[in-house]
Design a protein with these regions (language model features):
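N-terminal transmembrane-helix/juxtamembrane module of multi-pass inner/ER membrane proteins
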Residues: 1-15, 46-74, 151-156
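Membrane-embedded catalytic cores of phosphoryl/pyrophosphoryl-handling enzymes
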Residues: 18, 63-156
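Alpha-helical transmembrane segments
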Residues: 8-12, 32-36, 99-105
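Membrane-helix interfacial "entry" motifs
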Residues: 3, 23, 27, 31, ...
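Small-polar-interrupted transmembrane alpha-helices in polytopic inner-membrane proteins
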Residues: 36-52, 101-113
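Membrane-water interface at transmembrane helix exits
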Residues: 22, 46-50, 54, 93, ...
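Short helix-capping/hinge motifs at transmembrane helix termini and TM-loop junctions
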Residues: 10, 25-26, 53-54, 97, ...
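Interfacial segments of alpha-helical transmembrane regions
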Residues: 17-45
Length: 156
């Protein structure tokens, strides 16, 4: 199960398909657009932070036991799967009538799957979740702040 979850979390496929389905179901293109924006920002942030911290993955630090999936060649901290999963789960919980608990359970399982399959330390997954939450929160503040402020009133 965790190997499958690890693969589903790859390239945001699970989240982007869920966002596309929600956008079609509720006829709201912003659901997909903002979920995609959260995914892209989360992916870019995790890549930047990985280069900054340059932390080895468990198989590099200790090659025994063998990981259950192929080990990515990039650094580990934070987990990109956790970052993108939590960013997308928060956006979907915010924009849709879907109950947030299952979204966060799936995000947590994807994050845990990366530890279970042996390609991340627990801190990588937890840090990814925190970064994902921060990105989604920033996106929400950006969008709701823009909606609230709206265009300037005409000069009087």
């Amino acid at each position: 199960m965790f190997v499958a979850l690890s693969h589903l979390g790859r390239v945001g496929l699970l989240w982007l398909l869920l966002a596309l389905g929600a956008a079609i179901l509720w006829r709201r293109a912003d659901i997909f657009a903002l979920t995609f924006a959260a995914y892209a920002a989360a992916e870019a942030s995790s890549q930047l932070l990985r280069r900054l911290f340059d932390r080895d993955r468990p198989p590099v630090a200790d090659p025994h036991p063998e990981p259950l999936v192929s080990t990515p060649g990039d650094p580990a901290f934070p987990s990109g799967h956790a970052t993108t999963s939590f960013a997308c789960a928060v956006v979907l919980a915010w924009l849709t009538p879907l109950h947030p608990v299952p979204l966060f359970v799936v995000a947590a399982l994807v994050a845990f799957s990366r530890v279970y399959v042996g390609v991340h330390y627990p801190l990588d997954a937890v840090s990814g979740a925190v970064v994902g939450l921060a990105i989604a929160t920033a996106l929400r503040l950006l969008v709701t702040g823009r909606r609230r402020s709206g265009p300037a009133p005409p000069a009087g």
